[in-house]
Amino acid sequence: MFLFSLTVLSALVLITESIPSVATDFPFFEITKKFDDIETYNNDYGILKFQEQEPMENLTCASCEAPSERECTLNQTAVVCDQDPNIACLTFEAFNNFTMTTTFRRGCFLSGILCENACRSFNASQDGNLTSCVQDCCNSSLCNAGSLPTEVTTEASTTAQETTATSTTTKQSTGASTTAEPSTTAAPSTTTKQTTVASTTATTTKPTTAPQTRATTLPTTAPTTAPAPIACGGVLRGRGTFTSPGFPGNYPNNVRCEWRVFLPRRQAIVFRIVSLDLADPGDSLEFFDSGRVIRTFRGLSRRKRSPSHRQTTNEKVLGEGEDGYYDDQEYVDYYYYDGRRKREPYFYQRRKKRRQQDRIVIQGRNQVAGAIFQSDAAGNAAGFSTQFVQGAADSESEASASSESSDED
């Protein structure tokens, strides 16, 4: 028994020694080790990195430049960019604060690392006058191409189909008349008379009636609904005059007009109100500086004389002969009436002027200033007329601007 167990133990030892080692002899570990060596070799020489950043060949981008996105889309063309890994398709829109214009552009752009270099380079070419700029870069062919809405095109196509349909029906009807007549008169042996009669009737009667009535009814119904737009507002430059719509006639209801001007440093603009006649408190003329309203004129909400008020014969003005302490250039007269609006004032007061009511001076600080006119639906009047002069800031304009108070009486 002892000898049998000894032989079995020796046999097991021989079997275990003959089994190959998993850590060294199995071929799978040799294969993975070879792949690890290849990966480290590629990383050392940058082969994998070069394959990931390989540029796209023949990148095609949409190219156009216009004041609006719609005009740019209408005029866009496809261009092939240079083969460069840093070139991308660009779309950007910028607003120039000095010229008050918008530029919309598409095309190839050498972006480098950041796409925002487009706004920086364009702002440098515009002397730093851009107030807003939006850019977008992409790296697939025609990824920056724009498209227009299909509503206008479908209407045009449907009208074209209707006109073509009417023309085809008239031609078919004339062809039927020419073929029907020879079939009925095919019994006689003479064929020359039949051909002459068919040609005369087909050319004289059919084409003159159907196309004319169809063409006159379709185009006359559509273009009668669009109202004429009211043109007002704009960009102010140099010197000139701007007025309310329809001046010296009454301005329309529910209208808003805005005039803007860009004021660089060491420049100023002077507004002088020549005439002012507003109907009610819902109608106003505002002057703003950098989005902040600095002066507002409204319709008569208080029984006080406005800058456009004309003196009547019943109003009394104190002169230097009656009161030596008053000066007409430094004081203004106020007349108060009762609820029935009698012409005779029941209360009269003379107060010293705080500022010139018809003159507004704004100093330049590289900002946007201007005026806004608004009217409601309660009524209308003659409106206003304002003169403006833009130029270099002097001591007189600075002194007049500093003497003006911020609130209106």
UniProtKB/Swiss-Prot annotation:
InterPro entries: CUB_dom, Sperma_CUB_dom_sf. Component of the acid-insoluble and acid-soluble organic matrix of the aragonitic skeleton (at protein level). Residues 1-18 form the signal peptide. The lineage of its organism: Eukaryota, Metazoa, Cnidaria, Anthozoa, Hexacorallia. Transmembrane segments: none annotated. This is CUB domain-containing protein. SUPFAM superfamilies: Spermadhesin, CUB domain (SSF49854). GO terms for molecular function: serine-type endopeptidase activity. GO terms for cellular component: extracellular space. Keywords: Disulfide bond, Secreted, Signal. Residues 154-230, 389-409 are annotated as: Disordered. It is found in: Secreted. Residues 154-229, 392-409 have a biased composition (Low complexity). It comes from Acropora millepora. It comes from the Eukaryota. Disulfide bonds join 232-257. PROSITE patterns: CUB (PS01180). Residues 232-338 form the CUB domain. Pfam families: CUB (PF00431). CDD domains: CUB, TFP_LU_ECD_TRP.
